[in-house]
């Protein structure tokens, strides 16, 4: 199965995920209601790290939880033992095999903290050391670059949020996500055309900046990673707020800026940034569900409309995945054979 096959499989993978691990989600919610936690700590690497960023925003905004990202090296390299007994500790890993992520969860379990694995392998070492397991049920992911395990990880986090604080309208929006993912896949022809125009000439599109904010900061990070690992593009991701604190000095006409700017709390700032980029003669690729915002870029990618902000990263990443794949092909590279990478990365 190719990378493109797995990108196209995401609506069906989402349907499977929405039906998976129902008992585990109920058990987690019961545990946290009977023994409330003060915070959440998430351990992850690579693409899963970007799912963790989504968890920071979603569980913070929707559930009122303080969410921090673990630094696995504190445990694995330095032998540290951060006090997390009053936290829910989550390990996110498609393979569940990275020793440093397993180590963080093991250390938390020794302190008596509730632990949760979000993984595509329910028999993995990560699952074995966790109190609860949400299986992604994405099916085998053969491509080196993670796609369907990323979107199903986001769905798993959204389902966790909903289990902790149920809401009928939110549940209905979540149930619609497979269909919205299918709608998002329909952007491929326009995305391919943009990728060919940007990256078709030898030596073109070897650098770019990717900017998102709020929930879409996770999308910016994941979009940039896909461009790096597949297309060998020096793609630098930023929060739009951080971008203005210095890195904006990097912008110049020959460095495209990819901006995720859908409707929502961060929209006004993204629109202001797009106006500033235009004044500086910088070409932008704008991904948005608002036509007026898309018109501010030289190129535009339509995101499905009507998706709640807290769920939108699940669909906004899909055209970004397609874009990275087509940029890779336009640069004469094979997206199914990324350089120096293997499917399972085990860091200590």
For each of these PLM feature ranges, what is it?
Residues 223, 270-274, 316, 339:
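Composition- and surface-driven signal marking solvent-exposed, interaction-prone regions
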């Amino acid at each position: 199965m190719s990378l493109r096959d797995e990108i196209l499989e995401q609506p069906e993978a989402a349907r499977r995920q929405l039906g998976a691990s129902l008992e585990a989600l109920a058990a987690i919610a019961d545990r946290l209601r009977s023994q409330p936690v003060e915070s959440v700590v998430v351990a992850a690497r690579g693409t899963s790290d970007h799912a963790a960023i989504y968890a920071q925003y979603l569980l913070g905004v929707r559930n009122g939880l303080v969410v921090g990202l673990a630094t696995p090296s504190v445990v694995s390299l330095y032998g540290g033992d951060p006090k997390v007994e009053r936290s829910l500790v989550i390990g996110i890993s498609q393979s569940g095999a990275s020793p440093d992520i397993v180590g963080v969860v093991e250390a938390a379990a020794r302190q008596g903290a509730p632990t949760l694995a979000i993984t595509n392998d329910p028999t993995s070492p990560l699952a074995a050391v966790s109190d609860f397991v949400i299986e992604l049920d994405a099916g085998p992911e053969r491509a080196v670059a993670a796609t369907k395990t990323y979107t199903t990880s986001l769905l798993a986090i959204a389902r966790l949020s909903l289990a902790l604080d149920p809401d009928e309208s939110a549940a209905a929006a979540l149930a619609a996500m497979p269909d919205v993912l299918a709608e998002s896949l329909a952007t491929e022809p326009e995305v391919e055309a943009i990728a060919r125009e940007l990256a078709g000439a030898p030596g073109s599109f070897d650098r770019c900046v990717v900017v998102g904010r709020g929930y879409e900061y996770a999308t910016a990070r994941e979009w940039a990673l896909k461009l790096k690992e597949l297309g060998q593009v020096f793609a630098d991701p930023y929060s739009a707020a951080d971008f203005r604190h210095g890195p904006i000095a990097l912008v110049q006409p020959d460095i495209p800026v990819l901006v995720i700017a859908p409707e929502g709390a961060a929209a006004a700032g993204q629109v202001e940034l797009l106006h500033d980029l235009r004044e500086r003669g910088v070409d932008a690729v704008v991904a948005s569900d608002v036509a007026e915002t898309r018109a501010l870029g030289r190129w535009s990618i339509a995101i499905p409309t009507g998706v709640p902000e807290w769920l939108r990263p699940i669909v906004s990443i899909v055209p970004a995945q397609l874009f990275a794949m087509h940029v890779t092909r336009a640069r004469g590279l094979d997206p199914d054979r990324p350089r120096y990478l293997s499917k399972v990365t085990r860091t200590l």
